[in-house]
């Protein structure tokens, strides 16, 4: 396996680790509605950071974005909005299914669709089955799905031991939402593929290959921001139990602490895709669709590791922990299989 491929896998792991940890600062926010907290963190992760980093990277910020027509920008923006819908559905999925079942189905669906639909839509179906490397990467995707399923089953065992149930368990609604979440969340993978002209234009301006995807985040995450912020503002305006005015009426020290934690959560959330761009830049051109599989499977892997480090599995017995470790090992195996496939 070549050094660039190893680096690509490594950076995808770092990005996924940030994704697995980003909600920890949000948990420290007190006496705020989820909508206010999510909006503030999201404002930094979807708008402030993408714009600031692009402003810093691009020699001529406005000329760069002005060089693209609507036929190029609109699909990228809409795929970003599609991914934003997936974010909202993710929370609803957890509401109607258990955490483990919701994550297992949603991540499994988005991993498969986001990984395989890109080469199919590009007309590169032969790449998947027509070469030894393509077949091996497909095997790696299958192994990753199995690993995600095992980790999800470990979560189910944990929930049974701890007596955790979904807030409003509804199998039919939960399954529909989980599948929808998986489909819509794959919008990020599609957006990255649609943004290739933006990546090429950034590289033509002399930007390092590791950073060429970052300017496209202004458009991609702009689409996600419209959906997420619109959803949050609508709820703040219409739901009786929550109020922006009440959230901002807290004592000044608490307001400052809440704001800092929300912003930190937003920064950590953005870092997952910052390093996703680094990983993506090191993946061979014929296998860029594998970036999504690496990110999502490592997200589940890192989530399991974080849970163990924070002793969330301390009192659940040996079987759930052993199952979790097995699932994590299978995901690591999947990453190695995919890496060998790309190097073939």
From Swiss-Prot:
Q: What is its main location?
A: membrane
Q: Which reaction does it catalyse?
A: L-rhamnopyranose(in) + H(+)(in) = L-rhamnopyranose(out) + H(+)(out)
Q: Where in the cell is it found?
A: Cell inner membrane
- The organism's place on the tree of life at top rank: Bacteria
Question: Mind naming one GO cellular-component term on file for this protein?
Answer: plasma membrane
One Pfam family here: RhaT
Q: Name one GO molecular function term.
A: rhamnose transmembrane transporter activity
Q: Which UniProt keywords apply?
A: Cell inner membrane, Cell membrane, Membrane, Sugar transport, Symport, Transmembrane, Transmembrane helix, Transport
Q: How does it sit in the membrane?
A: Multi-pass membrane protein
Record field: transmembrane: 4-24, 38-58, 68-88, 101-121, 137-157, 175-195, 207-227, 255-275, 290-310, 324-344
The answer to whether keyword Transmembrane applies is: yes
> Which InterPro entries does this chain map to?
L-rhamnose-proton_sym_RhaT
Sequence similarity: Belongs to the L-rhamnose transporter (TC 2.A.7.6) family.
Q: Which HAMAP family match?
A: RhaT
- Entries under NCBIfam families matching the protein: PRK13499.1-1, PRK13499.1-3
What does this protein do, in the record's words?
Uptake of L-rhamnose across the cytoplasmic membrane with the concomitant transport of protons into the cell (symport system).
Listed name of the protein: L-rhamnose-proton symporter
- Source organism of the structure: Pectobacterium carotovorum subsp. carotovorum (strain PC1)
């Amino acid at each position: 396996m070549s050094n660039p491929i190893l680096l690509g896998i490594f950076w995808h792991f770092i990005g996924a680790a940030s994704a697995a940890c980003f909600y920890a600062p949000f948990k420290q926010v007190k006496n705020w509605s989820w909508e206010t907290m999510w909006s503030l963190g999201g404002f930094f992760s979807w708008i402030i950071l993408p714009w600031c980093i692009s402003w810093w990277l691009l020699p001529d910020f406005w000329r760069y974005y002005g060089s693209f027509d609507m036929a190029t920008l609109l699909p990228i923006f809409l795929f970003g909005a599609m991914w934003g819908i997936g974010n909202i559905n993710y929370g609803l999925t957890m509401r109607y299914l258990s955490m483990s079942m919701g994550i297992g189905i949603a991540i499994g669906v988005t991993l498969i669709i986001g990984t395989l639909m890109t080469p199919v839509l590009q007309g590169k179906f032969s790449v998947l089955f027509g070469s030894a490397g393509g077949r091996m990467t497909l095997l790696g995707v299958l192994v990753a799905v199995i690993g995600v399923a095992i980790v999800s089953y470990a979560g189910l065992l944990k929930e049974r031991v701890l007596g955790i149930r979904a807030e409003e368990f509804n199998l039919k609604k939960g399954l529909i939402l989980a599948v929808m979440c998986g489909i819509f969340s794959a919008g990020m993978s599609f957006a990255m593929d649609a943004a290739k002209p933006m990546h090429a234009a950034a590289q033509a301006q002399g930007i390092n290959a590791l950073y060429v995807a970052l300017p496209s985040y202004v458009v991609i995450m702009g689409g996600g921001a419209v959906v997420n912020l619109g959803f949050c503002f609508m709820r703040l305006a219409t739901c009786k139990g929550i109020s922006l005015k009440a959230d901002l009426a807290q004592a000044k020290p608490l307001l400052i602490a809440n704001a800092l934690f929300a912003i930190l959560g937003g920064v950590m959330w953005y870092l997952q895709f910052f390093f996703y761009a680094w990983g993506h830049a090191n993946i061979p051109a014929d296998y860029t669709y594998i970036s999504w599989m690496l990110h999502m499977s490592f997200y589940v892997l890192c989530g399991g590791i974080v849970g163990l480090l924070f002793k969330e599995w301390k009192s659940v017995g040996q079987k759930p922990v052993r199952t979790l470790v097995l699932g994590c090992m299978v995901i690591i195996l999947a990453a190695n299989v995919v890496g060998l496939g790309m190097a073939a």
